[in-house]
Amino acid sequence: MHTTLLSNSMRGAALCTRVSSTTLNPVTLQTSAIYQTISLKNQTRPSSTSTVRFLKASPTLRTSSARPQAQIATSCINAKNTISVRSNSTTSTSAREEAAKLDWNSYFKLRASRRRYTLASSIVSSAVSTVVGVQVLSSQNLENLGAQVMGLDPFVVLGMATAACGAVGWLVGPFLGNAVWGLVNRSYKKAFLVKEKEFFDRIKRYRVDPSSNSMTNPVPDYYGEKIGSVQGYRQWLKDQRAYNRKRRSFIK
């Protein structure tokens, strides 16, 4: 009797344990699944918010990184402009200082010396080119060939060729003379060029209009080549005024 009661009670306990395990297992599974989904959401949310924040912050970063580049570019442009202005001002001041070292009388003296150098070099170069041309023509017997082609006397052809060689040397002479003069007077070259520019500006400003030129009223030294001193420049100005007076009186 007792054994049957004990066995029945044990069976009931076993059944209870089975029922409890079968009924509780789905609940535990559901709770574990919910916990996993919550944990996954918690894991994914920070990453999504961080990406959104990064995407939102990226334009500001781009703009902030672009602003220093624009500032650097503008500063470089301003620096270049200031450097160019300073260089122009320094060149103008240096040119004025160089021009101040040379007065007008010294400028006219240097101008006359340059003209003498160019004239002497033209004479020398024309003589050299003539001698060389005669030697080349006589050795190559080109005068006979020219006489056959043009039908002229060989002496005439030789004379024309010699004159052409001398003309070439005369034209080349001023370039050589200017080069030699620049080497001799290189200490005054910059100041001389500044004074020369100023002188020709004055000539262009005060010279007369050559459209009304005539035999009775010729243009007085249109390019100012005869001016050799300050007194000569003043006389040139007087001649220009006299020409204008004659022109106005003739028109009236």
From Swiss-Prot:
Point out the transit peptide region: 1-87
Where does this chain mainly localize? mitochondrion
What InterPro entries does the annotation carry? Pam17
CC per GO annotation: PAM complex, Tim23 associated import motor
Q: Any transmembrane segments, and where? A: 117-137, 155-175
Question: Topology in the membrane?
Answer: Multi-pass membrane protein
Which UniProt keywords are listed?
Membrane, Mitochondrion, Mitochondrion inner membrane, Protein transport, Transit peptide, Translocation, Transmembrane, Transmembrane helix, Transport
User: GO terms for biological process?
Assistant: protein import into mitochondrial matrix
Which domain of life, per UniProt? Eukaryota
Can you say where in the cell this protein is located? Mitochondrion inner membrane
Q: Does the keyword DNA damage apply?
A: no
Complex and partners: Component of the PAM complex, at least composed of mtHsp70, MGE1/mgeA, tim44, PAM16/pamP, PAM17/pamQ and PAM18/pamR.
User: According to its UniProt entry, what is the function of this protein?
Assistant: Component of the PAM complex, a complex required for the translocation of transit peptide-containing proteins from the inner membrane into the mitochondrial matrix in an ATP-dependent manner.
- Per its UniProt record, what PANTHER family does this chain match? PRESEQUENCE TRANSLOCATED-ASSOCIATED MOTOR SUBUNIT PAM17, MITOCHONDRIAL
Family statement drawn from the similarity comment of this UniProt entry: Belongs to the PAM17 family.
* Protein name as catalogued: Presequence translocated-associated motor subunit pam17, mitochondrial
Q: Please name the source species.
A: Emericella nidulans (strain FGSC A4 / ATCC 38163 / CBS 112.46 / NRRL 194 / M139)
Tell me what gene encodes this.
pam17
